[in-house]
């Protein structure tokens, strides 16, 4: 308290400006955040200088040296002093110039920030200079050495020991250099693709070894050829050019746009995207590049829309995307983030509408193409169909006019998908029409025969009182499923009782249950009439008006007359579960029970009994009583406060699965599973356990499946099948480096490679063995997925998604099944295994393994 008073009486500290050196260091750390940012700034400077040849050299992935050389215009001598000073630039002069800026850089912060974070040396030669100049700068951006340096026109910037002035960041940078390097190459790929007519190359040197090329483009004026230079010609074969279409009315309505908005041609989109055929996409989003006015950026909404539309046609893969969005510079704000990759757009909804309509149109036309295989085909009888080259070259439109017969392969060898869809839609519409009872069926299946037998037998079993009309109220196949087996299967899956309600309102009770009437239902057309069927138990018949029933007991002097209560006219309500024998009594049973009750009451007589009571004095103190009451009240409040804190509040329902899992992860540790007490097994599928006052239910199959799955993940070494000839992989230099560094992980997954150190980069690794397991086969696409996973977490044991699916299938088959009776030791073993798992809360297929049922303390309190 005294400290607080003394601090409040101290005079407020004066507000003073931070010294320029500290400001420079603080702000520089916010401009250059990573290796990719540093390389990006240097490459953009070269592009802004009009270079046609950019060469990037790295040492030890960029830890020791980053050097970018270009053949641009160079720097004039009068600009040497301001070259690395904060907010010194030749791109803009005032804020209004931002709306018209066409260069990558405009803030004048990049070189100044690099000087603050590393040792920077620049050599440059302008066209007007006779000889080049080499400049060395201090951390404040001041020139400390200036010497003549012979070189051709252009500029070379060398950055040594990046982040050396920030010890913590420098240590983190060195520790994660592989991940930083992979991100840098991803960023560099974007500039290689979009820089038409510019040759870009990158090499990396490890220690004193030779330089290894990372990426290289040939300076082609075409973006398509740049894609081939970076990712190989195989990638080009799976791409289709982007075709822009005006937004459709339905898409405009989805985005809340009017028809007049759709007429504005604000955007022009060009580029390439993967075909939607399964197998040509990617297993991840590692090759998606977006540009706005040829500036690489990360438009989150555009990226999400492209992937969502692609998943409508190929839900298991991601597309390769290169899209450039051209728009008036006045509609764009690029001054949002330090790296300029977050860009704000006017009329963004219109862009999304154009993009969605165009993608749907492209993929629809791609899906409707039927590729004709060159392999020999078989007709219905199994004979070979000879395919002529002239027939294969015929367009689809011509072939639609030919005979519709598919049996004669000579006359028609190609069918339009649209005609197939039309045929299938006609088939489904005819099948879904309700059949008339009088319409004969030419081919009745066994199921249809059963349904017909059920209709006839049901009609015959009903009495002749006009209870059920044959055409309207009989159970037939035209009014939904009525097969007893079908009905039983539906009820078994739904988990309801055995009474089923037909579409006409009839209730069919379980044959095992006993009720007073076999059918009690009202017709939809006449709800006032009542139908009665003979009782299975041969109970006495009651009059339709529910008249009085005279019941006589065995004793002559005692008689009783009772009125039977009217029963509901329709027992087949949707809530009807099951008929039980003891719930419905006949009138004679009711009469007999009441007579017995009267006999018992008549025989009971009250007798007065005199009891001698003893009087004992008792010490009593009002103060002690009040004290005890106060103490009990305090204890009750304390216990109530403890009970109010409930560890588990989530319900057992699919909507709260995530909340329940979070609660379990928070409150249950791995050691607690061994402390749980086994209560028993429920329904041959669940284990009931107790931990302190909490009761849990555990899915015996799901928990055993997850344990087996994790054991397979950790310890299984897949056996590989050697290939007849080594297979060349279409890998980039970065992906090839990741593969070589993680060969042991690939071998544990069943892949094996031969590495040729003397071969050119991107061709050093060749696949010689693939994992095989019964009916599971794997290929190069699984190698790509594993490389992508290892790029984010190098050295960590990873499994491709298809290997995980195989392990999940195996774990499911070898686990304890639902319906298996377990003894206490077996149940204890399953619960103990949960404490040995990394993620015990879900099975490999996503089903929950454990849920909280109740707290005994809360139940006893209530």
Swiss-Prot record:
Gene3D superfamilies, alphabetized: 3.30.230.10, Histidine kinase-like ATPase, C-terminal domain, MutL, C-terminal domain, dimerisation subdomain, MutL, C-terminal domain, regulatory subdomain
Enzyme Commission code(s) on record: 3.1.-.-
Mutagenesis / variant outcome for changing residue 128 to L: In LYNCH4; uncertain significance
UniProt effect for mutating residue 705 to K: In MMRCS4 and LYNCH4; likely pathogenic; loss of DNA mismatch repair activity; decreased protein stability
Outcome after substituting residue 475 to E: No effect on protein levels
Residue positions of motif Nuclear localization signal: 577-580
Effect of mutating residue 779 to R: In LYNCH4; uncertain significance; increased DNA mismatch repair activity in an in vitro assay; no effect on protein stability
Effect of residue 60 to E: Normal DNA mismatch repair activity
Localization terms from the record: Nucleus
Consequence of substituting residue 470 to S: In LYNCH4; benign; no effect on protein abundance; no effect on subcellular localization; normal DNA mismatch repair activity
Subunit: Heterodimer of PMS2 and MLH1 (MutL alpha); this interaction is required for the stability of both partners. Forms a ternary complex with MutS alpha (MSH2-MSH6) or MutS beta (MSH2-MSH3). Part of the BRCA1-associated genome surveillance complex (BASC), which contains BRCA1, MSH2, MSH6, MLH1, ATM, BLM, PMS2 and the RAD50-MRE11-NBS1 protein complex. This association could be a dynamic process changing throughout the cell cycle and within subnuclear domains. Interacts with MTMR15/FAN1.
Record-linked PANTHER family: DNA MISMATCH REPAIR PROTEIN MLH, PMS, MUTL, MISMATCH REPAIR ENDONUCLEASE PMS2
Protein name: Mismatch repair endonuclease PMS2
Species name: Homo sapiens (Human)
